């Protein structure tokens, strides 16, 4: 379907606005993926705060100009599905990674974070805010328990030396 100039400008503005508010972006090739699977991917994306859009390559290149994701311009070749993470930097990458496990035809092209192309696998493994807090609390808890054990052992050693 042919788009007129106004439609193209609207698409570029919409994607540019999404890119400006996003924390990270992931680009994938969705050729060969069933429509039902893509519908479920879009539903999961909405639930996880990920903006998904299939955009023509020229429009996608224009949309990312002047954003942190300008480094992705060379990736827009062939059918491209772009996902912008709005709430957590790893949300889109994690969503695409899980979807790719179920759909062998779905493949990553690239991912960007803070103005640089990064490995999508690394981006997908970033902990969420709650996971990071839980890990920090676990480390703090282990450190204090370890300190207590070392203190008790030192007191025991002192008492043994005094008795000897």
Curated annotation (Swiss-Prot):
Q: Which Pfam families match?
A: Ribosomal_L10
**In which domain of life is the source organism classified?**
Bacteria
- One MF term from GO for this chain? large ribosomal subunit rRNA binding
Q: What are the GO cellular component annotations?
A: ribonucleoprotein complex; ribosome
Q: Does the keyword Repeat apply?
A: no
GO terms for biological process, alphabetical: translation
Q: Where are the transmembrane segments?
A: none
Q: Which InterPro entries match?
A: Ribosomal_uL10, Ribosomal_uL10-like_sf, Ribosomal_uL10_bac, Ribosomal_uL10_bac_type
Keywords associated with the record: Ribonucleoprotein, Ribosomal protein, RNA-binding, rRNA-binding
Q: Does the keyword Cell division belong to this entry?
A: no
Q: How does it assemble?
A: Part of the ribosomal stalk of the 50S ribosomal subunit. The N-terminus interacts with L11 and the large rRNA to form the base of the stalk. The C-terminus forms an elongated spine to which L12 dimers bind in a sequential fashion forming a multimeric L10(L12)X complex.
- What is the documented function of this protein? Forms part of the ribosomal stalk, playing a central role in the interaction of the ribosome with GTP-bound translation factors.
Family (UniProt)? Belongs to the universal ribosomal protein uL10 family.
Q: What is this protein called?
A: Large ribosomal subunit protein uL10
What is the protein's species of origin? Photobacterium profundum (strain SS9)
Q: Identify the gene encoding this protein.
A: rplJ
